[in-house]
A protein has these predicted regions:
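Gly/Pro-enriched, hydrophobic low-complexity segments
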Residues: 169-261
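Bacterial signal peptide processing site
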Residues: 20-22
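C-terminal motif of bacterial Sec signal peptides marking the signal peptidase cleavage site
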Residues: 15-18
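Sec-dependent signal peptide recognition
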Residues: 3-9
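Acidic/histidine-rich, surface-exposed loop or edge segments in extracytoplasmic proteins
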Residues: 31-41
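N-terminal mature ectodomain segment of secretory-pathway/periplasmic proteins
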Residues: 39, 45, 51-122, 161
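Flexible, processing/modification-adjacent segments and terminal tails
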Residues: 114-186, 211-212, 254, 262-269
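Short, basic/low-complexity N-terminal boundary segments at the transition from targeting/disordered tails
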Residues: 50-59, 67, 71, 138-144, ...
Length: 269
């Protein structure tokens, strides 16, 4: 269970996010920049139409170039955990107020520091357990916010199902995502509806196992809003992702110091 007291685990995938600083010295037009798949994306088994739709989604989100240039992302996951992620370095800050818990770690090497109830955890075994927990929480919570950017991720096979309508009656194209050998629960399956009108994701369904025919849940992706140079959605129907902010720069101490941070004063885009 990743989301204790809130939800069962809905995603355990290892999401391969780019952590390299883009080359800002080269001017690249969006058409030439493209939307290349992550290494390990199952191109051979994926449908051409599904890939074309995924590329249209990326354009609607602001374009691959703007996504790659986005560095710091901050959000509150369903009122439970607050995340701040440096996409270039892999550094993450997770705060869980209900547990008086702050975790500072790096998703690439899964090392870091943890403070619980005002005291830093120094026991090696306990710290490693906390790092594993932090990583799982980040994988889960970031996918709930950033899934549409990850349609061509490593390990993903993308299939086109056909035309469909959402529960709210929106005309859409339906995709299926399955996974191979990545993450915590690679047996999961998702169906993703893409709006004919906006090319943005407007609904998803989660299946604990790829062989399941009935989803565990179906939820909307609504209220798309521009943050910085990209589009993000926090409305999942009964659940809300809030306090979404994009930063070009943040003090290094955000990722290294347990001291409280007032993100509203740090100049979100």
């Amino acid at each position: 269970m990743i989301i204790k007291k809130i939800l069962p685990v809905f995603i355990g995938l290892l999401i391969v996010f780019g952590c390299n600083t883009p080359n800002n010295e080269t001017t690249i037009v969006e058409e030439d920049y493209g939307n290349p798949p992550a290494e390990g994306f199952n191109l051979a088994a994926s449908d051409k139409k599904a890939i074309e739709i995924a590329d249209e989604v990326m354009k609607a989100l602001g374009g691959r170039k703007n996504w790659d240039l986005t560095q710091h992302i901050h959000w509150n996951f369903f009122g439970s955990r607050q995340h701040t992620w440096n996409k270039y370095t892999g550094d993450v800050r997770i705060e869980t107020p209900s547990q008086e818990l702050i975790m500072l770690f790096n998703i690439n090497d899964r090392t870091g520091r943890v403070m619980k109830a005002g005291r830093e955890i120094t026991d090696a075994d306990t710290l490693q357990q906390m790092m594993n927990s932090a990583y799982s929480a980040w994988v889960n919570d970031s996918y709930w916010l950033l899934m549409p950017f990850k349609l061509k991720d490593s390990g993903v096979t993308l299939k086109y199902v056909g035309e469909d309508t959402t529960q709210l009656g929106e005309d859409s194209e339906l995709l299926t995502l399955t996974f191979d050998g990545v993450g915590v629960t690679p047996q999961n399956k998702y169906q993703v509806w893409v709006s004919d009108e906006t090319n943005l994701v407007n609904q998803w369904a989660y299946f604990p196992n790829a062989t399941d025919s009935i989803p565990r849940f179906v939820m909307p992706w609504a209220d798309w809003t521009k943050h910085g140079d990209i589009m993000l959605s926090g409305n999942r129907g009964e659940r809300q992702i809030t306090d979404i902010m994009i930063f070009d720069e943040l003090p290094a101490s955000v990722y290294t110091d347990f001291a409280p941070v007032d993100f509203s004063s740090l100049g979100a885009k």
